Amino acid sequence: MEKCSVGGLELTEQTPALLGNMAMATSLMDIGDSFGHPACPLVSRSRNSPVEDDDDDDDVVFIESIQPPSISAPAIADQRNFIFASSKNEKPQGNYSVIPPSSRDLASQKGNISETIVIDDEEDIETNGGAEKKSSCFIEWGLPGTKNKTNDLDFSTSSLSRSKTKTGVRPFNPGRMNVAGDLFQNGEFATHHSPDSWISQSASFPSNQKQPGVDSLSPVALLRKQNFQPTAQQQLTKPAKITCANCKKPLQKGQTAYQRKGSAHLFCSTTCLSSFSHKRTQNTRSIICKKDASTKKANVILPVESSKSFQEFYSTSCLSPCENNWNLKKGVFNKSRCTICSKLAEIRHEVSVNNVTHKLCSNHCFNKYRLANGLIMNCCEHCGEYMPSKSTGNNILVIGGQQKRFCCQSCINEYKQMMETKSKKLTASENRKRNAFREENEKQLYGSSNTLLKKIEGIPEKKEKTSQLQLSVECGTDTLLIQENVNLPPSSTSTIADTFQEQLEEKNFEDSIVPVVLSADPGTWPRILNIKQRDTLVENVPPQVRNFNFPKDNTGRKFSETYYTRILPNGEKTTRSWLLYSTSKDSVFCLYCKLFGEGKNQLKNENGCKDWQHLSHILSKHEESEMHVNNSVKYSKLKSDLKKNKAIDAAEHRLYENEKNDGVLLLYT
């Protein structure tokens, strides 16, 4: 008879009959193996028992784990303390032999929260007789009920399990596995996951610190309770509050938790597990350098004003050229056409009159606009300081019939000095008068120099010793008589003549610059007209071409004199005096826009407009445009100013003729 001992118990072939069950004996044999005893034939037969292969689909077993004693405690096996109870549908097997403690031990553990483990849906590769099998597990925690009678304590199967579990019989090795089924390797956890499982590991809600000396997933006989005191660290450990990663609801104790393989998130249900997904962050591409910006780096994101969207840049070096482009575009967009000078520039002033906004590019244009429209501002005329009320600035200066307000007396004094400096500048008529007077004196002096040269050449040789020639010149204007004694050596006479000749040549060159009168054909005018040419065209308006055989174009259309007439909505007819026809280019031009207009316009460019099919529409649209109206105002104002200046010049010319008759008397002695 073969024997083996387990902690003082001798096990023989009759041990199963004495214990009443093969499972009891098998569990005792496992205990023997775990403590280093060699396996006996009874255990071998138990492991190779056909009971294991009878039913591969066993119900899920709930294993209630109670605080185990320390590893060094002696194992006391007593037949009275081993009670086996299973569900009604479960067959006793060596693989599932479980021995609960006595009711006295359970009563001593009252107050310690026990945990219920449901093994389901986790695939572990285990070896049984050389064959590999896979299973899955999830863990459900619960509070088992403790009753006074031990025969009422049983194990029940879980209705939530989707697959059955089979555990291979292996030698019990305390310290090999922890409660959650993780292997201890060199004092560390090493969790094995199945690659095909959609739930990789189980959630654990530890209420008490587990001792690493118990393998809760291996068949083991629960020993008699020993006095066990937890350490201070174990007493201070508190369960962490765990919530569902999707719905953020807290996971209660006893609730099934789900976890995806390779993820640390826990879920309360499969619905939350399937609905929760981590989308991969797409790499953003920089606008300038076209590089994929890493998500870990802080990218520079700026809004685009035009689209109100955001653009990402890999670094500030990419941002700098883009900012420069935006600044250039912004500067172009901010430019508008000035109402006064018609230049495309940055607008500095905007004036709204009768719901019409007038844009002005500079202070000079703004002052012109104010004077033209009679606007008065509550600010100092000199420094521009704002005065909130009219009573603030009592310093008022009347200049040219207009009241100008100043903030202080110093501004008035500076403004007066500035006006005096401007008044010292000669007007155009005074400049012309002074130039004419200078020319007359030059001519007379040039003639006198020639006379002196002739006299010097006719002097006899005996008088060559004379070193000096005394010349007395008396000249005066009105009652003023100037006497000069000029000593001219013979060598200086030629220098004087050359100087006068150069002055006359410069004067003739200046006179040659003055352009001649332009022709009446606008097609022959230069692209840019100077001030004198423009004044000439304003004073002498070119006539409109009439009674002319206008040529036809390729479509058989031609210009007609009817375009010179505009029919108003009330039926009245007016003449378009600004419309000019060019016989050289067979096109029409706008006189006002040609003289004062800027920008692109069919009626002011070099070739003019020759779209005879749509000319009526073009003319109607053009004469109602803001640019044409402004140019017509400038034309009328310049024409009136030229008329006034012409009258003034005529009066000044008469005065000059009278002064000329009084003349300048030159006396040569």
Swiss-Prot record:
GO terms for biological process: negative regulation of transcription by RNA polymerase II. GO terms for cellular component: nucleus. The keyword ATP-binding does not apply. A zinc finger (MYM-type) spans 265-299, 311-351, 358-393, 404-431. Signal peptide: none annotated. Changing T116A: No effect on repression activity. It is found in: Nucleus. Changing N112H: Abolishes interaction with ETV5. Abolished repression activity. GO terms for molecular function: zinc ion binding. Functions as a transcriptional regulator. This is Zinc finger MYM-type protein 5. It comes from Homo sapiens (Human).
